[in-house]
């Protein structure tokens, strides 16, 4: 896997992996990171990159929140709390807070913002492209953090789509 810093100028694209329920973040055919579901019955995902590996697992009474943990030690790295619209807040123990928002219905664009509203990255659901903000000064954000944000945002996009599909099935069955 290549580091995300080597891929910033060339563009990043998410693609589905063949024969399993996973995705790869690629730049010019080279893998930057991967996201795999633990099993078809599990809501836990494993994300891997040159900068680290993490577990994303649902938390809370109705499993609406998500916890990010280090896949080796199991230590909690961050907690995501969604709001009523599907967007939410990602909080790290060091105090850094990010807002994950989306705009659009048919082809939404998901954006990660600093707590002050500065855009960090955007992911277009239709083209599956990741755009890192040109104004972002990576000096205050580690490469690992930027990689984790790109991978976690894709995970939240997939989780939101699955939740919507489940709700549609529930409505169809009860109607």
How would you label these PLM feature ranges?
Residues 1-175:
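Intrinsically disordered, low-complexity proline/glycine-rich segments
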């Amino acid at each position: 896997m290549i580091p995300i810093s080597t891929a910033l100028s060339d563009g990043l694209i998410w693609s589905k992996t063949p024969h399993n329920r996973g995705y790869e973040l690629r730049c010019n055919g080279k893998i930057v990171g991967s996201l795999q579901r633990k099993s078809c019955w599990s809501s836990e995902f494993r994300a891997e990159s040159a900068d680290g590996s993490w577990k994303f697992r649902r938390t809370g009474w109705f499993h609406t929140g998500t916890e990010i943990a280090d896949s080796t030690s199991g230590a909690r790295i961050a907690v995501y709390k969604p709001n009523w619209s599907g967007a939410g807040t990602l909080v790290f123990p060091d105090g850094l807070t990010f807002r994950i928002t989306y705009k659009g219905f048919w082809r939404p664009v998901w954006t990660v913002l600093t707590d002050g509203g500065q855009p960090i990255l955007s992911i277009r659901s239709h083209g599956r492209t990741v755009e890192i903000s040109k104004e972002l000064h990576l000096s205050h954000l580690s490469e690992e953090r930027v990689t984790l944000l790109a991978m976690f945002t894709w995970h939240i996009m997939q989780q939101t789509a699955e939740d919507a599909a489940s709700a549609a099935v529930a409505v169809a069955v009860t109607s």
